[in-house]
Amino acid sequence: MSEVKQCDVVVIGAGHNGLTTGAYLARAGAKVLVVERRHETGGALVTEEFSGFRFNLHATYMMMLDVAPPYKDLGLEADGCVYIRPDVAASILKKDGTAVTLHGDLEKSVESIRRISPRDAERFREIYLEYKQMSDEYLIPATYGKPVGSAQLAGTYMETELGKKILEVSELTPYQICQSWGFETPELGALLLYLICMWGIDPTETNSSYLVPLYFNRMLNATLVRGGSHRLSSTLQKAGILAGMEVMENHEVKRIIMEDGAAVGVEVAPTGTDGPLIRIDAKSIVTSTDPTTTFGTFISEEEMQQRSKLCLNTARNWEWEHSSLFLCHLGLRKKPRFKAEDQDPAVQTAFIRVFGVESPEDVVKHFNEVMEGHLLHDIGHVTFTTDLDPNQAPQETEPGSAVARIEAVVPYAPAQGDWADVAGPYGDRLIAKLAEYMVDFDPADIIRRYQYTPVYIEMKIPQMKRGSFKHGAYVMTQMGYSRPNVQCSSNKTPIKGLYVCGASTFPGGMITFGGGYNAAKTVAQDMGLNIWWTEPDEVIAAREKGLLL
């Protein structure tokens, strides 16, 4: 052991949750050290530059950034993190050269739908307002509060009309919910179901159906980070460092040091090596890693048998996502036009354009095929990040250039072969399919192309096993109060001094800040630190209505 460090709090992992916890606790007066195995912080907030084109390899659609407490609490906008809200949220492209388009503004969406079906327009308004209420009054506030057990939650739901509505939704599959909307325009249902399920939500399972209203609402209000997604993690890190937080990059945790049944520190070494080892003693250890790593690698099986057999079983039986993502990033000399722009000019700037499906049944069929390991149909969506932020392409050297981000839900291990062999041909298929909806696409306009496969996801970020993008499947035993298990979902573990804050903890994955935000408060309370931030008004209001504890 060549070196010993002392601090109040060690945070394992500098993804957005780890940085959030670290920044809050540093401002609360704690001496915080964040340990990150990679050469940069941010986790899934990855932006890499290729020939002047900025490709957001992972997290791109910020569903919750504008409502997440850390954005204001930590002053992220002032430090350079600015989100851009698109006017046109999404379009679904049809084979006949037309489209169905939805806007961030409700009335614009209603008018857009009215041109196709007046009945669907009014039905959409009803659903939108109902789901907005569910999101604003419960689902968003619940993200930044303590989880509630399922039995207690059901009882709480039954005490309010809003709760009853959420309970009704949660008992249906996403596809059944889509059917209940009763749209006579199948493409409208397909677009909404796709936007909900593109995050790996199985349209035929009820495990996470309570999230349908939230995803419906937030995907129509998703934002883009100006300059690239990594700007968000950079400002999070800056907020922490300005408060005294230290970040140790290129170092990986070898083990959590246990003494008398308590976590008292960590042992780290330069990434990819066995030493020299550094011991970091701390009063609290907060880990953003998944349960298999926290309870299966960092702590010995013998120790876990004594401290928590439940956590050991969680590590052994953790279920990873049943699907992953494939991305084909294109740096283009110019942006092509879509055929549907002639019928609906709004398609030109739609944040997300879905292609390859035209009915909810098409969406279900595609997801079923993916779950079985097949890549039979060319289905996905495309975003031109340069529509909102032209500087994500090298405008000085290539005026008018554009970045296209093609994304598809895929199996981790396709039946067609290894991703090393499949990626190129599959990317070709997606590009060719997308070109069917365009007027003037020319492959010669592709200056740079980069494909990001499920295997690459796992290689870049080992915590994302099997191409995971939520740190674990959304199944009943890994949701809500049970994420990662009933002993740890409130961030505190059965091991004294050890806390969890990552995407495998309540409320789950995506860039919500929920795990990191909630953990910061739990640790601050236990350590007697100054809780300098105030609880969001929405959380207080939800509690007063009996929707939260």
Curated annotation (Swiss-Prot):
GO CC list: cytoplasm
Regulation: The presence of molecular oxygen causes a 40% reduction in specific activity.
Thermal characteristics: Optimum temperature is 40 degrees Celsius.
Disruption phenotype: Mutant cannot not grow aerobically or anaerobically on limonene, but it can grow on perillyl alcohol or on acetate.
Induction (free text): By the monoterpene alpha-phellandrene, but not by acetate.
Alphabetized GO MF terms: oxidoreductase activity
InterPro entries, per the entry: FAD/NAD-bd_sf (IPR036188)
Pathways per UniProt: Terpene metabolism; monoterpene degradation
Known EC number: 1.17.99.8
Activity response to pH changes: Optimum pH is 7.5-8.0.
Alphabetized SUPFAM superfamilies for the sequence: FAD/NAD(P)-binding domain (SSF51905)
UniProt keywords, alphabetically: Cytoplasm, FAD, Flavoprotein, Oxidoreductase
The protein's required cofactors: FAD
Subcellular location: Cytoplasm
Chain's role: Involved in the degradation of the cyclic monoterpene limonene. Catalyzes the oxidation of limonene at the primary methyl group, forming perillyl alcohol. Hydroxylates the R- and S-enantiomers to their respective enantiomeric form of perillyl alcohol at a similar rate. Native CtmAB oxidizes a wide range of monocyclic monoterpenes containing the allylic methyl group motif (1-methyl-cyclohex-1-ene). Can also catalyze the reverse reaction, the reduction of perillyl alcohol to limonene, but with lower efficiency. Cannot use molecular oxygen as an electron acceptor.
Record-given protein name: Limonene dehydrogenase subunit B
Organism: Castellaniella defragrans (strain DSM 12143 / CCUG 39792 / 65Phen)
Gene: ctmB
